């Protein structure tokens, strides 16, 4: 097994490489994708009309599509899966597309909220499991959700979105299916990847609800004063198999994670591991990639607060964010202190009911969220 570590430096160097290095641009375009990859990616021209995401069906006036679309796209690209059977599959059993989003058990309220809000799918709570599933498998529900997130995808899961949309479109256009459940409905007009600024919509809120966290480290220094260190972290992992006859390595999470690092003006850390499989598998090996953004600088944490105040988290991480923000603001106003009511004491007290140790949950933040029209 071979591990390699990289640090992608912030603002200046990333832009310079992107604009001035043809070799770098090429490398960026051939990085591996998550499950299924980008394959032979089809490109679609933007019609610059993200507002009209539901076509030829009842428009739900309760939904704020401009905010719901990016949030759900981020959530699905983080902890969701769009399952579409390959058209070339030789399996006798055929199945239509389905969308699955996984929530930890504590976030059952959020799963139910999104299910009821979109009127798509069902929520399943597994007995003796620490997670719940939001499952959308009916054609109308899949059609609706694909329309909502259309134009807001930012990661390699866009490829699965495209295959799902194409399946739906082929189904709509089919003249051989007698019982077409999507008659008199327009095709999904597939839009390209969203390359807008990270701070322009709620995509990062959805992704953070899935894969981000707000941490508090307590450093008990000997030669220097003890400190409470708050930081925001987002890490995305991917893997794929490659053999001597397969050189189709495509897009990865590198681009989107670089954009997030650039937005907060921090470094992007990456790690890779090569795992050789059986020789009989034609020199096949599996590649693992990990990309991590960490925001620990006090002033940059303020920008984190500004973003998530504008586009609130909706999971129980919202409660962790509120506590985390208290510590960041206290340190910003008064500095580090081990005195009574100082940052050290606050950090200790917050961690008693925080992240994995949290036992107190409230859901008032799910009332009249920004995903709904007021």
Locations of regions flagged by a protein language model:
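Internal intein/HINT superfamily modules and their associated LAGLIDADG
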Residues: 1-374
């Amino acid at each position: 097994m071979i591990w390699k570590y990289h640090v992608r430096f912030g603002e200046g160097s990333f832009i310079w490489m992107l604009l001035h290095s043809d070799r770098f641009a090429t490398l960026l375009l051939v990085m591996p994708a998550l499950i299924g990859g980008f394959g032979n990616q089809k490109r679609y021209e933007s019609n610059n009309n993200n507002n009209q995401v539901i076509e030829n069906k009842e428009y739900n006036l309760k939904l704020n599509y401009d905010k719901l679309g990016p949030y759900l796209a981020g959530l699905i690209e983080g902890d969701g899966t769009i399952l579409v059977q390959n058209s070339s599959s030789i399996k006798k059993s055929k199945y239509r597309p389905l969308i699955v989003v996984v929530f930890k058990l504590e976030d059952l309220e959020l799963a139910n909220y999104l299910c009821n809000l979109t009127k798509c799918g069902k929520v399943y709570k597994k007995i003796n499991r620490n997670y719940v599933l939001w499952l959308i498998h009916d054609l109308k529900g899949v059609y609706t959700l694909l329309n909502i997130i259309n134009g807001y995808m930012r990661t390699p899961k866009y490829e699965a979105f495209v295959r799902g949309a194409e399946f739906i479109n082929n189904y709509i256009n089919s003249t051989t299916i007698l019982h077409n459940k999507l008659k008199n409905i327009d095709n999904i007009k597939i839009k390209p990847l969203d390359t807008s600024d990270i701070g322009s919509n709620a995509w990062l809120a959805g992704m953070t609800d899935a894969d981000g966290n707000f941490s508090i480290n307590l450093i008990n220094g000997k030669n220097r004063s003890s400190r409470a260190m708050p930081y925001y972290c987002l890490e995305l992992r991917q893997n794929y198999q490659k053999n001597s006859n397969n050189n189709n390595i495509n897009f990865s999470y590198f681009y989107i994670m670089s954009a997030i690092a650039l937005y907060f003006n921090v470094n992007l850390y990456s790690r890779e591991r090569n795992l050789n499989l059986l020789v009989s598998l034609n020199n096949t090996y599996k590649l693992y990639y990990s990309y991590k953004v960490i925001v620990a600088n006090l002033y940059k944490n303020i920008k984190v607060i500004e973003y998530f105040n504008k586009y609130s988290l909706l999971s129980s991480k919202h409660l962790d964010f509120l506590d985390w923000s208290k510590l960041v603001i206290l340190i910003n106003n008064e500095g580090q202190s081990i005195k009574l009511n100082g940052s050290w004491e606050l950090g200790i007290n917050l961690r008693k009911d925080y992240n994995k140790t949290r036992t107190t949950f409230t859901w008032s933040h799910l009332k009249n969220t920004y995903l709904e029209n007021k």
